[in-house]
């Protein structure tokens, strides 16, 4: 599920989204 975040997660860039 893609949610709004502040930094990168699971190797994703810090585009403002996190994947959980």
UniProtKB/Swiss-Prot annotation:
GO terms for biological process: defense response to bacterium; killing of cells of another organism. GO terms for cellular component: extracellular region. The keyword Cytoplasm does not apply. Keywords: Antibiotic, Antimicrobial, Bacteriolytic enzyme, Glycosidase, Hydrolase, Secreted. Optimum pH is 8.0. The keyword Secreted applies. It is found in: Secreted. It catalyses: Hydrolysis of (1->4)-beta-linkages between N-acetylmuramic acid and N-acetyl-D-glucosamine residues in a peptidoglycan and between N-acetyl-D-glucosamine residues in chitodextrins. It is an enzyme of class 3 (hydrolase). Optimum temperature is 60 degrees Celsius. Its EC number is 3.2.1.17. GO terms for molecular function: lysozyme activity. Its main location: secreted. It comes from the Bacteria. Has bacteriolytic activity. Monomer. This is Lysozyme. It comes from Lysobacter sp. (strain XL1).
